[in-house]
Amino acid sequence: MTSHYVIAIFALMSSCLATAGPEPGALCELSPVSASHPVQALMESFTVLSGCASRGTTGLPQEVHVLNLRTAGQGPGQLQREVTLHLNPISSVHIHHKSVVFLLNSPHPLVWHLKTERLATGVSRLFLVSEGSVVQFSSANFSLTAETEERNFPHGNEHLLNWARKEYGAVTSFTELKIARNIYIKVGEDQVFPPKCNIGKNFLSLNYLAEYLQPKAAEGCVMSSQPQNEEVHIIELITPNSNPYSAFQVDITIDIRPSQEDLEVVKNLILILKCKKSVNWVIKSFDVKGSLKIIAPNSIGFGKESERSMTMTKSIRDDIPSTQGNLVKWALDNGYSPITSYTMAPVANRFHLRLENNAEEMGDEEVHTIPPELRILLDPGALPALQNPPIRGGEGQNGGLPFPFPDISRRVWNEEGEDGLPRPKDPVIPSIQLFPGLREPEEVQGSVDIALSVKCDNEKMIVAVEKDSFQASGYSGMDVTLLDPTCKAKMNGTHFVLESPLNGCGTRPRWSALDGVVYYNSIVIQVPALGDSSGWPDGYEDLESGDNGFPGDMDEGDASLFTRPEIVVFNCSLQQVRNPSSFQEQPHGNITFNMELYNTDLFLVPSQGVFSVPENGHVYVEVSVTKAEQELGFAIQTCFISPYSNPDRMSHYTIIENICPKDESVKFYSPKRVHFPIPQADMDKKRFSFVFKPVFNTSLLFLQCELTLCTKMEKHPQKLPKCVPPDEACTSLDASIIWAMMQNKKTFTKPLAVIHHEAESKEKGPSMKEPNPISPPIFHGLDTLTVMGIAFAAFVIGALLTGALWYIYSHTGETAGRQQVPTSPPASENSSAAHSIGSTQSTPCSSSSTA
């Protein structure tokens, strides 16, 4: 009997131990994270100290770009020794062909790692560096025509600028910045630049930026220290910034890489992300293969195709709790175990997850993680000449292509933008972007350097590609098409020739700021698939349509899923297209829209370049349309502020929506309508202002405004909607009118540089004893027509006054000649008067008055 009780008690104790075992939450004590913690929290920003840009080198044989680096304030043992310099052309230049001179001045010797995109090979480039510094080139072809020389540069910005001008005649750009790991410079000359480079303190330009990552304090714990083939990481973010308007969505980047460079890690990851604020998690993985599942209550996005080395899926769960204990319990209850780490950050906008490699299990992991049909694609030795270079610019060992392999459709739509229109750059070798989902510039390798020429007229666009450039890039047996795969290339002895009508083969039009049309299409280089393509990645049923390169509308047997197409975007511009039938966005002839920003409500001088606005400061906006038809009008359909330059990505910070003001600070002004005495010059203006609220955790924002045509008549032959005033639009605008407005819209984008109050107080703090600088005078003036009217009236008044005086004087002289004896004034007064008149008047009547 006793033995039965002992057995029962022993079984009860065993069951208690078994149930208590998997609860590791009690074993995890939060502590400040160290460098060994797998997850690090950071705050990312972009800035420069001062600088300038000019078009002064346009007529010279080379561009001249000056970088003047300042110490970042580290101790002697923490000096940064390496800088990565990213070079690519400005947005208006597709491939940069001009010679360039770089003056790279640094306070101590540096190793400059050069990363280039869309810079033509065979062009002379000279790098002048400080004594002891060296330049390392990522491309052997680029280094063949590049030279490096050491120089003893002068100190100080102005001295260095004058030295460069004396040596080379002019300077294209001058940038002063603190030493950063990544510096992004766009080469090229833009005619909108000023003629001379004058250094300014508040120099803000997307062409010249440095990236700074500041570590942020975080707490966490590691619950499983041994590397596993499957890991679960929990990240909890309290707030993405300290801004009181943090209800607006902010991008939070999760960067996943191996803990050591030159290694490729195979993992199955589960990330549980939690933030009470409205954020968008942007997931990017490099050099890590396997599957990745993201679970979060917020929106989730993935990086570009080159930033997704893993098979990514996402799951939106609204029941994810907060705090460490609840999160760990929720993960275990939902079967996500074993939990590897938990991290909590009070403030951050970027997280780095670094993974260890369990080398002893790596061989088996590949078998279980990747379907057998695709294993051959991960073997670098089995690949043809078309390979994707390593993401890290060539120093990595991962010669194989990242998994999974995107198809043509996904790559095109991912890199073109949500509207299907290509961004004004080459997606294969992207330019620097600080925009939607890509708030920071990102390096992308694997560019295709081909020689092409584009011609277009009012009916078609023709692009010719040299065959030799394909062979030089290692391509053979490829299929060359436009975006529409039915539009195949024709071959002659030397070129591939592709022809597209302006409204076919995937060609998309977009109106440029110069009232012309830019037509976009892409060359798709498709290499035949390797082996069988019947297999699908594990867990494909969980993928959303279009996620990670598997579009929902493609058949399983499509061989393009298992080849890596290269996409080369090209465009062709037509100025003042006269055939409105080929492009229906501008059916009303000679119409010009414009938008300008001003600093005051006088609307005198528009702001040039990036508009600087302080927190809670006023922004004054003027939009106008110049047209020939007086019955045509326009309306401000939508205005919003966004961290994205792409106007098709909407934002919660709306100023005007469907003509109706949504922000309580919007104030409209009543400018006079301008009528010019020449045809096609009738201008309507609309002016408004609003108070800028700091709702985003970034210093660079974009004001997006959509203008739409309307008619002042009851009915318009081209079915334009009737113009509606803002107060009426807030109550009586129906869906049919909104749809009609969307068919004739023009979008303008203006960059805004946010000036934070904290930065202003820090700058003003040390100079309290100095007298306040005299603020620049504000000249209150009138518009041109009013001034012309006043001048004309003054001229008429002056002419009438002169005639009246002449009449009085001439008649007074004749009377004096007829009078023989003066009666009233004495003789002394008459002689004085006659002398005065004779001395001041030189007219023919002067002699008669004294006769």
From Swiss-Prot:
The modification Phosphothreonine is found at residue 840. Residues 816-851 are annotated as: Disordered. GO terms for molecular function: activin binding; BMP binding; coreceptor activity; fibroblast growth factor binding; glycosaminoglycan binding; heparin binding; PDZ domain binding; SMAD binding. Glycans are attached at residues 141, 492, 534, 545, 571, 590, 697. InterPro entries: ZP-C (IPR055355), ZP-C_dom (IPR042235), ZP-N (IPR055356), ZP_chr (IPR048290), ZP_dom (IPR001507), ZP_dom_CS (IPR017977). SMART domains: ZP. Residues 737-751 are annotated as: Interaction with TGF-beta ligand. Residues 810-851 are cytoplasmic. The chain crosses the membrane at residues 788-809. It holds the Pfam family ZP-N. Residues 836-851 have a biased composition (Low complexity). Residues 817-834 have a biased composition (Polar residues). Its main location: membrane. It is found in: Cell membrane; Secreted; Secreted, Extracellular space, Extracellular matrix. GO terms for cellular component: basolateral plasma membrane; cell surface; cytosol; external side of plasma membrane; extracellular exosome; extracellular region; extracellular space; inhibin-betaglycan-ActRII complex. It is a single-pass type I membrane protein. One of its GO terms (biological process) is outflow tract morphogenesis. It comes from the Eukaryota. Residues 1-20 form the signal peptide. Gene3D superfamilies: Zona pellucida, ZP-C domain, Zona pellucida, ZP-N domain. Residues 455-730 form the ZP domain. Forms homodimers and homooligomers. Interacts with DYNLT4. Interacts with integrin ITGA5:ITGB1; this interaction promotes the internalization and trafficking of ITGA5:ITGB1 into endocytic vesicles. Interacts with TGFB1, BMP2, BMP5, BMP7 or GDF5 and inhibin A via the ligand binding domains. Interacts with ALK3/BMPR1A; this interaction results in the cell surface retention of BMPR1A. Interacts with ALK6/BMPR1B; this interaction enhances BMPR1B-mediated stimulation of the BMP signaling pathway. PANTHER family: ENDOGLIN/TGF-BETA RECEPTOR TYPE III, TRANSFORMING GROWTH FACTOR BETA RECEPTOR TYPE 3. This is Transforming growth factor beta receptor type 3.
